[in-house]
Swiss-Prot record:
Signal is among the record's keywords: yes
Signal peptide: 1-22
Family, similarity comment: Belongs to the polysaccharide lyase 1 family.
Descriptive protein name: Putative pectate lyase 17
Cofactor note: Binds 1 Ca(2+) ion. Required for its activity.
Length: 394
């Protein structure tokens, strides 16, 4: 039996199980009825996002099918679907007057575009990259890096997909003029040095990217951004990994809903995987390898549902706890819950809150969350994939 036949059979079994999204009762969480998953961890199984498209050998001529595969709060993200294909042919950048063929020229256009790359390239941006609405940055088929300069800003826009690229060693942007559309060049005060900043935006999906070693955060979701899915990414070698929520006093972030699923939080990470303020974070089927301070934290009464994750604590006695509340007290009623998580090497999760905690997904957003023991397989291919034309992506 071939590798892909086994994958298909296991995926079919995986997707047919009843959904684990019931209301949560009691202080310590619910225990949903056991689904008939394999007792032993299978070696060839794909998560629901990947099984939607990766087995198709015609992915290169049907790239926009990817937009049908997101799950969770960002599942309706269109990106550049139904727009033209725009091909990046060179790595050069001009922040004010970008030239055709450059990445910046594509992302600032007003119309929907599905952006691909003609060849491998390392893009060092002159200033932060302002991405307009209805854009997909699709790195499949090439090795694409954005590195050694300012990186990506998704601000006050909607429907953006970033897939299959590496973003690392990002630096703060300079104060100065940056073009954000064909008709607008605005003065920017200078970006913080995040890999990706999502500011006041909705319907954003970050999938199969590699993120590491930036000046500030790897992903910041702030200023009432919502309908976000962050999936299948590989994070490594960084301090403050992922921030969800601007600050404790920014009450509009109560509307924020973010799904963090199927990611691999690898070695050399310190904290914020994620750190949440006010909003709702569904953290599902992620792998955590030996964080240095804590894995999941928050302040300002966020709701955090940790489901089916795989936590491996470090050998240090002071970093066994998964959770951290960024306050000295008063958090007993915060709704932080764990269900079907796996804890290794002494890792433990401190829950809080009472009563039910429904998962507010629509029928289109729901996906089956596997038990935590399957996570090593479900996250084995996190980060950019090796995609060859006329064949599936590995």
């Amino acid at each position: 039996m071939t590798h892909f036949t086994v994958s298909c059979l296991l995926v079919a079994l995986f997707l047919c199980q009843s959904l684990v999204h019931a209301a949560y009762n009691g202080y310590y969480g619910y225990s949903p009825a056991a689904a008939p998953y394999p007792a032993e961890e299978p070696q060839n199984i794909m998560n629901p996002v990947d099984s939607c498209w990766r087995l198709k050998s015609d992915w290169d001529v049907n790239r926009e099918d990817l937009a049908d595969c997101a799950v969770g709060f960002g599942s309706s993200t269109l990106g550049g679907k139904k727009g033209n294909i725009y091909v990046v042919t060179n790595p050069y950048d001009n922040a004010q007057n970008p030239h055709p063929g450059s990445l910046r020229y594509g992302v600032i256009q007003a119309k929907p575009l599905w952006i691909t790359f003609a060849k491998d390239m390392v893009i060092t941006l002159a200033n932060e990259l302002m991405v307009n609405s209805y854009k997909t940055i699709d790195g499949r088929g090439a090795k694409v890096e954005i590195a050694y300069g300012p990186c990506i800003t998704i601000q006050d826009v909607t429907n953006v997909i970033v897939h299959g690229i590496s973003i690392h060693d990002c630096k703060p942007g300079k104060s100065g003029k940056v073009r954000s559309s064909p008709t607008h060049v605005g003065h920017r005060k200078g970006s913080d040095g995040d890999a990706i900043t999502i500011f006041g935006s909705s319907n954003v999906w970050i999938d199969h990217c590699y993120l590491a070693s930036c000046t500030d955060g790897l992903i910041d979701v702030i200023h009432a951004s919502t309908a976000i899915t962050i999936s299948n990414n590989y994070f490594t070698q960084h301090d403050k990994v992922m921030l969800l929520g601007h600050n404790d006093n920014f009450v509009k972030d109560v509307k924020m809903k973010v799904t963090v699923a199927f990611n691999h939080f690898g070695p050399g990470l310190v904290e914020r995987m994620p750190r949440v303020r006010r909003g709702y974070a569904h953290v599902a089927n992620n792998r955590y390898d030996k964080w240095i301070m804590y894995a999941i934290g928050g302040s300002a009464d966020p709701t955090i549902f940790s489901e089916g994750n795989y936590f491996i604590a470090s050998d240090k006695s002071y970093s066994k706890e998964v959770t951290k509340r960024e306050v000295k007290g008063g958090w007993n009623n915060w709704r932080w819950r764990t269900s079907n998580d796996v804890f290794k090497n002494g890792a433990f999760f401190v829950p809080s809150g009472y009563g039910s905690i429904p998962l507010p997904y629509s029928s289109a957003q729901r996906f089956t969350v596997a038990p935590g023991n399957l996570v090593p397989s479900l996250t084995a291919d996190a980060g950019p994939l090796n995609c060859n034309r006329n064949g599936p992506c590995y």
